[in-house]
Amino acid sequence: EGAKDVAVYRDLDVIKEAFTGKKVAAMAEALFEQGKTTLAETLIRKVKIAGIAAPSGSGETEKASALVQAVETLRETDDDWYILLTDQDGDEAVKALCAWAEATEPTEAELGAGEEDHRKLYFGRTQNKSLAVTNRRSIVIYGDQDEEYPDAAYVGNVGPFYPESVTWKFKRPQGLTVPDLTNAERDALEEANVNFLTVEYKREYVKNGVCADGEFIDVQMGADYIAKNMRENLYDIFLENPTIGYTDAGFALVAAGVFSALNRATDLGIIALDPESEQG
């Protein structure tokens, strides 16, 4: 909806003024205004927003590729973020962003070649009941109301728990309308690992809290957090010690960084406790 330099915003009114009449302002409102139904003890009050020119191309596939390239261009100057939301929800855009998100996690070979790990997680909305994507690191939620943004509302409602492990199913994002779906359509969305707001026994909640590949959202986010925390611990050890020898003491020092990350993950519920040993 127009090029604009990336900036950090902490105030919804400032966002509305900077992006008057644009989808991003409505998405920010859905993200911020979750205080009535969230189970978290806090709310999201800090976001990074960047504006890009409308993707160009002769068809939706080319435009989707241009969108991904624009995101990659932004990453060249600012890669210090984790979750991506966009105002584009066309089929080709969602498919391209799902594929992009999966590719942001470097392979062991790429890490060995010196590539940094700045893996991302994509949350997107679709209005297509038959959308089929199976990418890792991507969460798609169905919504049939043009003026509602279930992807932003979902992140705003459950995201504040991060990095604590939390079930993304059975959550009730504020400001969403339950989509008009038949039983067969709900079953199809479940089989496709597309999340959606539903009503069962007169209770509204999101089913099923999964990524497009079927992995639970909290499992994916937990794995990412462990990798991030472990890497930071190891870099701190390397930077704070003039020499780390190939000795028992050196190995123990490095191992301490690894176990510190795992213990932290256990405290956050990412790694389960053994009921007998009470260890992660």
List each language-model region with its residue ranges.
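Surface-exposed assembly/interface segments
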Residues: 1-280
